[in-house]
A protein has these predicted regions:
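Short secondary-structure boundary elements
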Residues: 1-82, 86-94
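Tandem amphipathic alpha-helical repeat scaffolds
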Residues: 11, 49, 67-73, 106-120, ...
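Short coil/turn connectors between adjacent alpha-helices in alpha-solenoid helical repeat scaffolds
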Residues: 13-20, 57-61, 69-81, 99, ...
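Amphipathic alpha-helical segments of tetratricopeptide repeats
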Residues: 30-34, 68-69, 86-96, 129-140, ...
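Alpha-solenoid helical repeat architecture
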Residues: 39-44, 75-79, 99-103, 138-150, ...
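Surface-exposed alpha-helical interface segments used for non-catalytic interactions
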Residues: 65, 78, 82-85, 105, ...
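Glycine/alanine-rich phosphate-binding loops at beta-alpha junctions
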Residues: 85, 89-97, 102-104, 109-116, ...
Length: 190
């Protein structure tokens, strides 16, 4: 549907049944994937939007993550956080499976880069603590050590050196248990 006036477009869109809207968004997403297969990166954000509106959780998650990655590479840190947060919100409506928990861990780790560049804006602590919780739930020692390291840095930056040190010590123990030198080395730097 093409309308020249935004108000007419909005009225026409809102007059469609929700089921029909979802179908249209899904078809638009598929058409973009087919037509622009060679240069999909240019359309990640649009695909995330259409697949979210179509309630295609798998594709919406995929394109929200890719949009966040793209924004991070382009130093658009606030945009990156918004896309990653969208992926987290989408996952929160999905079944509580191990795969979805792993996706939640992945997204929260990806969020840590823009959060660090933005000096940990409001809500950052909750993101990191949720990542720590998910890592403990599925027994993923590597991601747990990463979140403990991030929490150590967070509290150090926020002026709570004691709590930061506690997380650093716990991180080192976890990294030592996984025998991952890449996780042990950054702890001393922070």
């Amino acid at each position: 549907y093409i309308f020249k006036h935004a108000l007419i477009q909005e009225v026409a869109y809102n007059s469609l049944l929700i089921k029909r809207r979802k179908e249209i968004h899904g078809r638009i997403g598929k058409a973009i994937e087919d037509i622009y297969a060679e240069r999909l990166e240019e359309f990640y954000e649009m695909l995330a939007h259409h697949y979210s509106k179509a309630e295609n959780a798998e594709k919406a998650y995929h394109y929200l993550k890719l949009s966040g990655d793209k924004a991070t590479r382009n130093y658009a840190k606030w945009e990156a956080l918004a896309f990653y947060q969208g992926a987290i919100e989408l996952l929160s409506k999905q079944p509580d499976t191990e795969e979805n928990k792993r996706k939640g861990i992945e997204i929260r780790l990806l969020m840590s880069t823009p959060m660090r560049y933005l000096a940990y804006p409001e809500g950052s602590l909750q993101v990191l603590e949720e990542g720590e919780r998910l890592s403990r739930e599925i027994g993923d020692g590597r991601s747990l050590a990463q979140f403990l390291s991030l929490l150590s840095f967070y509290f150090g930056l926020k002026g709570d050196a004691r709590k930061g040190l506690q997380y650093a010590e716990e991180c080192f123990k976890e990294a030592e248990a996984t025998q991952d030198i890449d996780l042990m080395a950054p702890i001393g730097v922070q």
